[in-house]
């Protein structure tokens, strides 16, 4: 049962996933890209999750052996990038991921694969020999977008996992969420950018909080967010500055702030 609405301006579907449904477990918001909800499972419960009310039971691309999801992508030649998301796709057994990508290999218009995952940060042991072999065998240029919000999430085991991922030829990027009381200072953001880059991960996005029900206490207003980026820009090289963005339903891309 969904909770009673308690946040003015909040929503159970803050980013418009429902309206962007292309098939069971397939979401397409932006031209040329399709997001495949591979699973509803995650290694941890992120309290600010924008899909906290998402119906993973009904909207799971693994249902029916991926057939509906893969067919929907195959039927649209404008899709040249597939994003594996969830949940966390790396929470699936590697043989299930092989099954999925074997099906995607049959689609000639796919040119890139992207994986959104938090597991290399919170469970670096997941980056094992079998996973590394699978990643290295993929036929597409690969981007792995990890998710760390604070420099303290990195340690030697995470560094080792990132080194193994880089060894597959993947481009490693980090996306973070700006969270009140967690990383809402210039110093915290600087530490995060520097620490992620030291691990071989390029800062990518700093998301403004998606206003889903139950997370408003983490919100940082846009004025402060922009001031934080200005402060960060005064301290760091440009390649260490993540893009400050907000996702709004119906927009053709993430909205820069």
Predicted feature residues:
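Short, flexible loop/turn elements at secondary-structure junctions
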Residues: 40-42, 88, 119, 150, ...
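C-terminal accessory regions of radical SAM enzymes
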Residues: 227-257
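Iron-sulfur (Fe-S) cluster-binding segments and ferredoxin-like electron-carrier domains
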Residues: 49-61
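Conserved AdoMet/S-adenosylmethionine-binding subsite of the radical SAM
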Residues: 67-81, 90-236
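Surface-exposed cleft-lining segments at the edges of enzyme active sites
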Residues: 56-57, 86-87, 115
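Flexible, acidic/Gly-rich N-terminal and inter-domain linker regions that tether
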Residues: 1-28
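N-terminal pre-triad scaffold of radical SAM enzymes
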Residues: 21-50
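Conserved catalytic-core segments centered on acid/base and nucleophilic motifs
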Residues: 36-37, 82-84, 89-90
